[in-house]
């Protein structure tokens, strides 16, 4: 038995939640114990640009990108659990980071 931590990131929270739901369903089918999904704070990156190319610095525009993240801990992962996670087809815009938490 090993402990696995999955960290998922995406710009769109709806796509992220669908991916998390499919992971949770696949892990529960194998009989592993799961903790989460734990929502992490949304990271907001703001960019300020000047609207005109040369003058009018007082005229600016702001853009932001929001990065949503979730953490899932699989407490008692079996080889069957790892196999089902490998076969899972997730959305391409979701970034998945897998870590083994064994000491």
From Swiss-Prot:
SMART domains: Ribosomal_S10. One of its GO terms (biological process) is translation. InterPro entries: Ribosomal_uS10 (IPR001848), Ribosomal_uS10_CS (IPR018268), Ribosomal_uS10_dom (IPR027486), Ribosomal_uS10_dom_sf (IPR036838). GO terms for molecular function: structural constituent of ribosome; tRNA binding. It holds the Pfam family Ribosomal_S10. Keywords: Ribonucleoprotein, Ribosomal protein. Belongs to the universal ribosomal protein uS10 family. Involved in the binding of tRNA to the ribosomes. This is Small ribosomal subunit protein uS10. It comes from Sulfurimonas denitrificans (strain ATCC 33889 / DSM 1251) (Thiomicrospira denitrificans (strain ATCC 33889 / DSM 1251)).
């Amino acid at each position: 038995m090993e402990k696995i931590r999955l960290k998922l990131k995406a710009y769109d929270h709806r796509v992220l939640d669908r991916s998390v739901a499919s992971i949770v369903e696949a892990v529960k089918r194998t009989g592993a114990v799961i903790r989460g999904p734990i929502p992490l704070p949304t990271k907001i990156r703001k960019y300020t640009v000047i609207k005109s190319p040369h003058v009018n610095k007082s005229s600016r525009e702001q853009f932001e990108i929001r990065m949503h993240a979730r953490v899932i801990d699989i407490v008692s992962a079996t080889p069957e659990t790892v196999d089902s996670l490998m076969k899972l087809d997730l959305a391409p815009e979701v970034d998945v980071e897998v870590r083994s938490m064994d000491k």
